[in-house]
Amino acid sequence: MWAIPTYLLAAFAEIGGCFAFWAWLRLGKSPFWLAPGMASLALFAWALTRVDADFAGRAYAAYGGIYILSSLVWMWAVEESPPDRWDVLGAAFCLAGALVIIFAPRGE
C-alpha cells in the first residue's frame, strides 16, 4: 500500500513549502526562498492526487492526521524544538483517526 508514503511525501512537501514562506516573512530570509517553496507546494498538491481514494474529502481527512504527526517531526528535526507530551498525545489521537479512515474496509 502506497497511501502512507504518499501522504508523507505530501506532508513534507506542504510543510517545506509553507516553511519557505514562514522563513521569508517571519525569519527575515530572502524572497528567493519563495520559488522552491512554491515548487514544494505544487509537489504537495500533486502527491495528494496520487492517493487511492474515491473522494477528495476522504483523502484530505486521512491526510490531516499524517500532516499533524509530520509537522511535529519537522518541528523537532528542522526547528530543533522537541514536541512535548501534549503534542505527542494529540498527534496520536489524530493519527489513530487517520489510520481508521485509510484502512477501513470500504464496500464490504
From Swiss-Prot:
Belongs to the UPF0060 family. It is found in: Cell inner membrane. Its main location: membrane. HAMAP family: UPF0060. PANTHER family: UPF0060 MEMBRANE PROTEIN YNFA. The chain crosses the membrane at residues 2-22, 27-47, 59-79, 85-105. NCBIfam families: PRK02237.1. This is UPF0060 membrane protein amb1014. The lineage of its organism: Bacteria, Pseudomonadati, Pseudomonadota, Alphaproteobacteria, Rhodospirillales.
